[in-house]
């Protein structure tokens, strides 16, 4: 598991709304059985993303919005296959997390 990996959401109850989960946890905690993720939803689902809180990324040729306000810890067993890595968007991801916590 790598920081900023995007995983399929295998949960049949939520994968239609949140098809992907973004791993935001540092690689240095890879020994844990859990990880911290932020769900991604299709841009059209959210309608109007908050400017600093909900950055938009391309995953599998579609636009997805990071729902930073829904950050959570989950078991690694609850993640599907890795589909991409968003390390190239590191600044936007960290800025959204920082805004959630400090509003800066």
Predicted regions and their residues:
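A generic "functional-site adjacency" signal
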Residues: 1, 15, 87-91
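Short amphipathic alpha-helical segments, especially helix-boundary/capping motifs
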Residues: 1-2, 30, 70-74
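Residue-level detector of secondary-structure boundary/capping sites
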Residues: 12, 48, 84-88
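Residue-level marker of positions within ordered structural domains that often coincide
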Residues: 12, 26, 99-102
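Residues that cap or initiate secondary-structure elements
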Residues: 13, 43-44, 63, 72
């Amino acid at each position: 598991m790598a920081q900023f990996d995007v995983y399929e959401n295998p949960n049949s109850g939520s994968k239609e709304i949140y098809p992907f989960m973004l791993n935001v946890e540092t690689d240095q905690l890879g020994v844990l059985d859990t990880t911290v993720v932020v769900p991604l939803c299709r841009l059209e689902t959210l309608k109007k993303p908050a400017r600093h809180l909900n950055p938009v990324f391309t995953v599998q040729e579609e636009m997805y919005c990071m729902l930073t306000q829904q950050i959570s810890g989950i078991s690694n067993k609850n993640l599907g296959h890795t589909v991409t890595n968003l390390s190239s968007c590191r600044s936007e991801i960290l800025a959204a997390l920082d805004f959630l916590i400090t509003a800066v």
